[in-house]
Design a protein with these regions (language model features):
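Compositionally biased, non-globular sequence tracts
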Residues: 1-4, 9, 13-123
Length: 123
Protein backbone atom coordinates (compact mmCIF):
# COMPACT_ATOMS: atom_id res chain seq x y z
CA UNK A 1 0.00 0.00 0.00
CA UNK A 2 1.34 3.39 -0.94
CA UNK A 3 0.75 6.53 1.09
CA UNK A 4 0.82 10.00 -0.39
CA UNK A 5 0.49 13.11 1.73
CA UNK A 6 0.24 16.48 0.06
CA UNK A 7 -1.18 19.62 1.61
CA UNK A 8 -4.43 18.68 3.30
CA UNK A 9 -4.85 15.39 1.46
CA UNK A 10 -4.21 11.72 2.20
CA UNK A 11 -4.13 9.17 -0.61
CA UNK A 12 -3.79 5.41 -0.21
CA UNK A 13 -3.13 3.21 -3.25
CA UNK A 14 -3.68 -0.53 -2.98
CA UNK A 15 -2.61 -3.44 -5.16
CA UNK A 16 -4.99 -6.26 -6.00
CA UNK A 17 -3.77 -8.48 -3.15
CA UNK A 18 -4.08 -5.60 -0.68
CA UNK A 19 -7.67 -4.97 -1.76
CA UNK A 20 -8.37 -8.68 -1.25
CA UNK A 21 -6.72 -8.56 2.19
CA UNK A 22 -8.87 -5.56 3.11
CA UNK A 23 -11.99 -7.52 2.16
CA UNK A 24 -10.82 -10.70 3.92
CA UNK A 25 -9.38 -9.29 7.15
CA UNK A 26 -10.61 -5.70 7.32
CA UNK A 27 -7.07 -4.31 7.62
CA UNK A 28 -4.09 -3.38 5.47
CA UNK A 29 -1.14 -1.74 7.19
CA UNK A 30 2.40 -0.61 6.44
CA UNK A 31 5.09 1.35 8.24
CA UNK A 32 8.20 3.40 7.57
CA UNK A 33 11.06 3.12 10.06
CA UNK A 34 13.01 6.38 10.20
CA UNK A 35 15.47 5.01 12.77
CA UNK A 36 16.04 6.09 16.37
CA UNK A 37 12.69 4.54 17.31
CA UNK A 38 10.69 6.83 15.02
CA UNK A 39 8.11 4.93 12.96
CA UNK A 40 5.28 6.23 10.79
CA UNK A 41 2.52 3.63 10.57
CA UNK A 42 -0.40 3.84 8.19
CA UNK A 43 -3.38 1.59 7.85
CA UNK A 44 -6.66 1.19 6.06
CA UNK A 45 -9.40 -0.36 8.16
CA UNK A 46 -12.82 -1.53 7.03
CA UNK A 47 -15.67 -2.69 9.18
CA UNK A 48 -17.37 0.49 10.22
CA UNK A 49 -21.09 0.80 10.00
CA UNK A 50 -22.20 2.63 6.84
CA UNK A 51 -21.01 6.21 6.97
CA UNK A 52 -18.34 8.56 5.69
CA UNK A 53 -14.70 7.65 5.25
CA UNK A 54 -12.65 8.95 8.17
CA UNK A 55 -8.97 9.58 8.85
CA UNK A 56 -7.21 10.08 12.17
CA UNK A 57 -3.59 10.71 13.15
CA UNK A 58 -2.51 9.58 16.61
CA UNK A 59 0.88 8.73 18.07
CA UNK A 60 2.67 8.55 14.73
CA UNK A 61 -0.05 6.53 13.03
CA UNK A 62 -2.45 7.44 10.21
CA UNK A 63 -5.62 5.34 10.16
CA UNK A 64 -8.17 5.65 7.38
CA UNK A 65 -11.47 3.87 7.99
CA UNK A 66 -14.08 2.91 5.42
CA UNK A 67 -17.28 0.93 5.83
CA UNK A 68 -17.24 -2.71 4.78
CA UNK A 69 -20.14 -1.96 2.46
CA UNK A 70 -18.24 0.82 0.64
CA UNK A 71 -15.04 -1.27 0.44
CA UNK A 72 -16.90 -4.22 -1.09
CA UNK A 73 -18.78 -2.03 -3.57
CA UNK A 74 -15.55 -0.33 -4.69
CA UNK A 75 -13.51 -3.54 -4.94
CA UNK A 76 -16.14 -5.26 -7.07
CA UNK A 77 -16.27 -2.57 -9.77
CA UNK A 78 -14.03 -0.74 -12.22
CA UNK A 79 -14.22 2.35 -10.01
CA UNK A 80 -10.73 3.77 -9.48
CA UNK A 81 -11.28 5.03 -5.98
CA UNK A 82 -13.29 6.25 -3.06
CA UNK A 83 -13.03 10.00 -2.56
CA UNK A 84 -14.30 12.13 0.27
CA UNK A 85 -13.75 15.37 2.11
CA UNK A 86 -13.58 15.29 5.92
CA UNK A 87 -13.46 18.88 7.13
CA UNK A 88 -10.35 20.38 5.51
CA UNK A 89 -8.85 16.95 4.74
CA UNK A 90 -9.34 15.29 1.33
CA UNK A 91 -9.17 11.48 1.56
CA UNK A 92 -8.60 9.16 -1.43
CA UNK A 93 -8.49 5.36 -1.46
CA UNK A 94 -7.44 4.12 -4.90
CA UNK A 95 -6.54 1.00 -6.81
CA UNK A 96 -2.84 1.04 -7.76
CA UNK A 97 -2.48 0.88 -11.55
CA UNK A 98 0.51 -0.15 -13.62
CA UNK A 99 2.64 2.70 -14.88
CA UNK A 100 2.15 3.56 -18.55
CA UNK A 101 5.77 4.64 -19.07
CA UNK A 102 7.64 1.87 -17.23
CA UNK A 103 8.91 -1.03 -19.38
CA UNK A 104 6.67 -4.11 -19.16
CA UNK A 105 9.49 -6.18 -17.63
CA UNK A 106 9.64 -3.72 -14.69
CA UNK A 107 5.92 -3.50 -13.99
CA UNK A 108 4.45 -4.40 -10.65
CA UNK A 109 2.59 -7.66 -11.37
CA UNK A 110 0.12 -7.14 -8.52
CA UNK A 111 -0.96 -3.70 -9.77
CA UNK A 112 -4.23 -3.29 -11.63
CA UNK A 113 -4.08 -3.04 -15.44
CA UNK A 114 -4.09 0.64 -16.35
CA UNK A 115 -7.45 1.65 -17.88
CA UNK A 116 -5.63 3.89 -20.39
CA UNK A 117 -3.44 1.07 -21.64
CA UNK A 118 -4.48 -0.81 -24.81
CA UNK A 119 -5.75 -4.28 -23.90
CA UNK A 120 -3.15 -6.10 -26.03
CA UNK A 121 -0.32 -4.64 -23.89
CA UNK A 122 -1.96 -5.39 -20.55
CA UNK A 123 -0.33 -8.11 -18.49
Amino acid sequence: MKLRLQGNSVRLRLTRSEVERLLDTGLVEESVDFGAGEVLAYRLHSGLEPGPVQAVFRQGSVTVSVSTEDAQAWAGTDEVGIYTQSGVLAISIEKDFRCLTRPLNRQEPDAYPHPGQPSETRL
